[in-house]
């Protein structure tokens, strides 16, 4: 998975927890590199990475079930520090001679730990006799400890909530230190990697930038690279990093499908040409895309048309350039993790970016993926390192199919223009109110519904516009943003007065789940 060797690495063995990525983010935040490896290939990962410490994740499985996941014995034979979390604690105990039973009292949500013994993991954090909030999510629990372990903290329903074998540097907890609901959890993980494992850590985006540039130069040599640039954070940072490495050997192609936000394509082109002197081709293919999309109402059909046309247009333009051996792609570490899944085991096929699909195979090109070790928040930090304007770094997520999936029902050029204007006004009001950075994602949706209205002395029969805004940490779950009514009234009034074709505005108060963030 790695592009370059990392001398100080933490191996995270994934047993299928939904929050394993949060463990990795906490380790990275402490300045230490880590990789997630599914338990099926953990032994191979251990030998490949040569880690300085190991963390065992949670899991929906039960150690009581036949064939449930286990950590490879090489981890416990290595003499390395090991930190088990939830299921990781249970399998550690089961494998080392302890006992795990199904709990009579399931424990989900907030719990409170009582510190019963001093422990190196508590250094500078918790003191003997203190009480601390943690987040539990378990049914099974440890009922007998392996030899050498002792209890260092308990909760009302988990007498072995925090255990340690300090001689072997084994630590294990029944709660989840990686989630925000355990306020001191990130510090506990930092103490494990720094004070227990003795890793000082040199994982910074400044250091990563230098290593990535070197790796790109080594991979590409004097060959040409093409990059599909959307103006989003991932493709923008990837393009700048590659440009820093190989300069004019990189050509970026921005395919304008006519489904972008107001002035978006022009702004992206202007920024990259004026500030970075980057070779960028702006291909206006809007007529081609919208021509095929007009009248199409099924959202999956829309996506397929857009994906197919993007590949066709990009391939045509790339062939005109000729001689490119490499295709740049903004693959992130979560994409890599998903492709090497808990359920499916290791896979040699990395998940393709939704826009460039099968292009590498079709065009006989090799991939350059300079961001494939990074999480989204790290990409943003790297973007700042590279001098990308904050207006680009902090942009809300925007779907690949663009406005096509914010226009439910059949698409027409007229409806797209109405939506584009309404969306621009809405985002303008959000920025004026100083709310943009507090919101994960905000956008307008043009509904396939017309209602009666009165404007001046006349009757109108025009479209309904829905406004959407959500708060989220990772997009997996989301809550609608709680605007005050004065803001909503102001935004609605502007849209109705300034956008011909809309006479009613509503606000979407659906959370995820049960709804999704996008409407299609």
From Swiss-Prot:
Keyword check for Transport: no
Reactions listed under catalytic activity: XMP + L-glutamine + ATP + H2O = GMP + L-glutamate + AMP + diphosphate + 2 H(+)
Class of this enzyme: ligase
Species annotation: Rhizobium meliloti (strain 1021)
NCBIfam families registered for this protein in UniProt: guaA_Cterm (TIGR00884), guaA_Nterm (TIGR00888), PRK00074.1 (NF000848)
Gene name tied to this protein: guaA
Active site: 86, 176, 178
Pathways involved: Purine metabolism; GMP biosynthesis; GMP from XMP (L-Gln route): step 1/1
Transmembrane segments: none
Record-level Gene Ontology MF annotations: ATP binding; GMP synthase activity
GO CC annotations on file: cytosol
Domain Glutamine amidotransferase type-1: 9-202
Segments forming domain GMPS ATP-PPase: 203-395
EC number annotated for this UniProt entry: 6.3.5.2
Chain residues that bind ATP: 230-236
Protein name according to UniProt: GMP synthase [glutamine-hydrolyzing]
Subunit and partners: Homodimer.
Any single Pfam family the record assigns to this protein: GATase
Keywords associated with the record: ATP-binding, Glutamine amidotransferase, GMP biosynthesis, Ligase, Nucleotide-binding, Purine biosynthesis
Gene3D superfamilies (UniProt xref): 3.30.300.10, 3.40.50.880, HUPs
Biological function: Catalyzes the synthesis of GMP from XMP.
Classification via InterPro entries: Class_I_gatase-like (IPR029062), GATASE (IPR017926), GMP_synth_C (IPR001674), GMP_synth_GATase (IPR004739), GMP_synthase (IPR022955), GMPS_ATP_PPase_dom (IPR025777), NAD/GMP_synthase (IPR022310), Rossmann-like_a/b/a_fold (IPR014729)
Source domain of life: Bacteria
Entry-linked HAMAP family: GMP_synthase
